């Protein structure tokens, strides 16, 4: 309904979940269990595709996109590249978070510091 775009217009940081439909569909193809196939189909209805997440960030004119709750969570750099590929040419200023990602936004400036909790 556009509410995320409406309420995130011009923000410094948009924190958004994302699903890779391509990867989930590949998982469905190799799923040995009908129950898992159904789950992998159902989750596509209530998670935002990664491309749409980028479009929301672009159309809302956000400064930076932090992607959390990635479905499925990329397990290596190849999977991460496939997961993030739909953002190419749509929105380039993003970070894929994982456990331990920390965001610091100091008061008084527009700096966004993203690092890991050690």
Feature roles, as predicted:
Residues 1-9, 102-118:
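Core dinuclear metal-dependent hydrolase active-site scaffold
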Residues 2-98:
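Cap/insert and terminal regions of metallo-dependent hydrolase folds
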């Amino acid at each position: 309904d556009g509410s995320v775009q409406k309420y995130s217009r011009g923000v410094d940081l948009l924190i958004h979940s994302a699903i890779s439909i391509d990867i989930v569909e590949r998982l469905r193809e190799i799923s040995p269990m009908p129950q898992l196939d159904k789950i992998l189909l159902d989750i596509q209805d209530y998670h935002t595709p990664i491309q749409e997440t980028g479009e929301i960030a672009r159309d809302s004119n956000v400064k930076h996109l932090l992607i959390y709750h990635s479905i499925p969570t990329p397990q290596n750099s190849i999977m991460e590249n496939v997961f993030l590929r739909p953002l190419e040419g749509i929105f380039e200023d993003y970070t894929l978070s994982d456990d331990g990602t920390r965001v610091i936004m100091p008061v008084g400036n527009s700096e966004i510091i993203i690092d890991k909790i050690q």
